[in-house]
Amino acid sequence: LGYEEMTRANPDVDIWLPGAGAVVLLPTQFILPEAPRDGLVLNVAAMRLYYYAPEDQDGQTTLYTHPIGIGRVGWATPLGTTRITAKAANPAWYVPESIRKEHAEAGDPLPAVVPPGPDNPLGAHALRLAMPGYLIHGTNKPAGVGLRVSHGCIRLYPEDIASLYEMVPKGTPVHIVEQPYLAGWHGDRLMFSAHVPLEETGGDWLAALELIDRRVQDAPEGVGPVEIDWRRVARIAREGKGVAYPIEAGSPVPAAWRAASPLVRTEAVANYRPPEDEDVPEG
């Protein structure tokens, strides 16, 4: 899970120092964005990547998902359909002139090339897109995953990009979308989740209403007339927690839905430091 996913889902919890006995909601139920279900699909509003692996010999497709970091305000990750054109292990970072200029003006000059190693913002693996200058890559600052900190590239946790790098071949299609509002059927429950829209766009509330209407029309066989609790929809959208909740009238309210989630006790300690100023953001 990424930083924003955790903080939005747990607004009253210090994610880095939650305290002994704190109950933390892990938002691990994801609604798939509307996009072709082949190759890579990146929803920048949810800061999440999906990989639809090729069908196996039984005609089954395995879906993988990982949190991502995306471009900051002013350096937004571009939307659209592209493809993987090249793969590189232990890549050097050829710093774009625009980024070198920005850092020089801030009194923090960068070299023309950052060699592979622990100081390289690209991490140990990179997938080059057909969009000139843009990569899907690892990072030497994992705490930035789930934040808007890059110059437009997509960053993953080191362990996530390592596994993705092995699975994704050159030529794989990549669909980059911005869909803060998501809806889909989970059995006989119509689920809805809302993420905070990107600052530049502000989201499209009418599109959310139209999406829910389409999902109602596509109700699974055997599901009776569907009545939507529109007040609940509006509240979920307003809060923007990124957590999927049922929205039919009479279905469990969000608090009851959360209370029914299984509790898991863990003594694990986070390996990543809290995010600091990103002094060397990647391209």
Regions found by a protein language model. Give the residues of each.
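Extracellular LysM carbohydrate-binding repeats and other cell-envelope/extracellular binding modules
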Residues: 2-39, 180
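Gly/Pro-biased beta-strand-loop elements
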Residues: 30-142, 166, 194, 200-282
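Short, basic/aromatic beta-hairpin or loop at an interaction surface
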Residues: 1-3, 142-152
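Short beta-strand-centered segments at strand-helix junctions
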Residues: 151-165
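N-terminal targeting pre-sequences for secretion and organelle import
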Residues: 162-205
